[in-house]
Amino acid sequence: MAAEHDSDSVEPPGSEALLDAVLRTLYDLGETEGETEQKRIRKKKAKKRDSETIEDVAVEPLPLPGSPVRGQKKSASSFFQKLREELQSAPAAPSEVPVTTAVSLSPPKNGSKLVEVVEFQSKSKKRKLKSDEDEPAKNKTKVVKKDVDIQEFNLEKARLEVHRFGITGYGKGKERVLERERAIMLGAKPPKNTYVNYKVLQKQIKEKKIAVEEEKRAARETDIFKKKKKKGRGQEDRRSKKSAPSILSSGQVGQVGKFRNGTLILSPTDIKKINSSRVAK
């Protein structure tokens, strides 16, 4: 008993506060009067000591349950070890759990901290990928549209050049009128109509009608004159054909009938002449 009392007296002064803190975390013992201020101080001290003990455990591996402990800290470390054995009385081995904690809490060798690598994919990259995929289709449509526009522009330009070249064949007065019509066709505003008095307008209409009628009469007269000429020529041709004796049917040569396309054609008069000549003989 005396040895046990001596070992308790050797314990460090902060062991009682640590024991109280551990017991209060495990069991709800309730609060007494005047403990509020002391409790705060004890909690701060307990947190500092717990952090120190955890760092010691992380740096130095925990000893096995049968191994001896260093000098003065023998009683406190043995007490904590017993508590852990009681709390962690599970089917798993008790020595394996602290080793894992030690490994997890052990800092890296060169004093460098472990850094988590996070890959961040921004929306702009996704949009760029989609735009890169859509670019060839857009380029194709643009090329097709450009080709169509070029063809249409060339056709319009050619049409205007042909129209301009056709105007040059007329006189200056008509050329100006045609140029004005071309400008109106391209979208220019036509000139305003000139206002004329009603009586003057009636005279102009009558003059136009008279001019049209005269042109029609002249055309008719020319047509009649041409027809008369054609008729006279036709009658003269017929008379010349009848009056001109055929070389083959002339009595001087002694040939009867006419040749057409290599065949001899005899008229009924020719046949009668032949028959009468035979009877006379």
Swiss-Prot record:
InterPro entries recorded = FSAF1-like, SSU_Processome_Comp
The main location class comes to nucleus
Is the keyword Phosphoprotein assigned to this protein?
yes
Q: Does the keyword Phosphoprotein apply?
A: yes
- What's a Pfam family in this record? FSAF1
Q: Which residues carry this modification: Phosphoserine?
A: S67, S75, S267
GO biological-process terms attached to the record: ribosomal small subunit biogenesis
User: What keyword terms does UniProt attach to this protein?
Assistant: Acetylation, Chromosome, Nucleus, Phosphoprotein
- Under the cellular component aspect of Gene Ontology, which terms does the record hold? chromosome; nucleolus; small-subunit processome
What function does the entry list? Part of the small subunit (SSU) processome, first precursor of the small eukaryotic ribosomal subunit. During the assembly of the SSU processome in the nucleolus, many ribosome biogenesis factors, an RNA chaperone and ribosomal proteins associate with the nascent pre-rRNA and work in concert to generate RNA folding, modifications, rearrangements and cleavage as well as targeted degradation of pre-ribosomal RNA by the RNA exosome. Prevents helicase DHX37 to be recruited before post-A1 state.
Oligomeric state and interaction partners are given as: Part of the small subunit (SSU) processome, composed of more than 70 proteins and the RNA chaperone small nucleolar RNA (snoRNA) U3.
The protein in question is named: 40S small subunit processome assembly factor 1
Encoding gene (name)? Fsaf1
